[in-house]
């Protein structure tokens, strides 16, 4: 994404003074997230003929793994919403207790939100951006009630977010650059959100993407007749909350510029990520170069001469020739005067394993996942759930990072409810209470929780139906039914055995 081109476009057309320098940091983070940093992973080595060749440095791609782990910790299939108004809850989540229906299901919200957390954690910021398709507007561009309309969401990382106005740390106006396909060709959708006198104006512009001679993508604005159906150039709404919400990793940015944007979760761990890849590459190279080698006197070999008159020696075993190495003199050998000698290099597995483990521990610590998030023992990885020594660090950092995500989730849900009521005519309450129920299995595992609930049920501290619901994923009604059936069966058994056999 050539975001600099759109910054230049906005500065020119809207007389802004946006700066593109901070997006250079985001590009570096993107390279680390992909596991391909040219200055690090493109190694220069001397070839036998004296030329310089490139070798790809092996990479564990830990920055991406770290972002995936944070996304799975913070927003996963066990994250649920609690909405006070029943009709509003049914509209968003569906009527079942598993919250698998409603508008959020139509939008594939949870899987997209999980991906957005990963993108926000590598890029420094994520944005939920709402739009309404098939909206009716008057001649002035004001949005009118549109029962035929449909709510849509975009999920943008920091490289697609251009803050325009920031008040007390909160982005109030912004532009969003979203990539898409139109007619099988790449295109870009630029949406600008501005506020004037309590009214919000959303401007939509489309650009087609072409490749310049230099290889840099060029963007040319499309005319209205070529844009997607169901979109308008501009709409204005009054009394609405922001149609976007942003969140970032919960760390104070120590980089200059980029007001309104955050920094990557691994921004402070780039040296540790580099150490991980160097240690892993060294481990890999030791294994690759550590095969058996046989040094032999060239007089043992059959000779042949090519058409240019150069003599070549044929190794004793042409199939496994990579293990044979010629000695330059007929008398020579390594440490002995023998015609041939076998050599088995030491792989140094213990030292290499420890180097990789030390680097992973540093990476885990710097990315706020605790000191031993990634610990390999006998071929298995021990996560922080089992390693109690680092659990407290993880718990504190996870709780801290839930705050901005919860704010963003509630913000975009209120925008969706406002549009649903005021534009689509849905029977919802935008002011209804909304809270997020987080998954805390990183603190106590599901098995530990179930076992404790079972003990409490046996002791009479909690109803048995609660244990059944948790153990077998039952609804409250199903759990009560199971409890009643179990009680009836026990009474039947007592009646059958009353008075003896």
Protein language model features and the residues they cover:
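Activation/maturation switch segments at domain boundaries
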Residues: 452-501
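Residue-level preference for well-ordered alpha-helical positions
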Residues: 104, 364, 393, 417-421, ...
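Charge-rich, acidic-biased intrinsically disordered regions
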Residues: 26-27, 44, 133, 139-153, ...
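Extended, helix-rich architectural segments
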Residues: 1-172, 498-501
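Extended, charged amphipathic alpha-helical segments
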Residues: 226-389
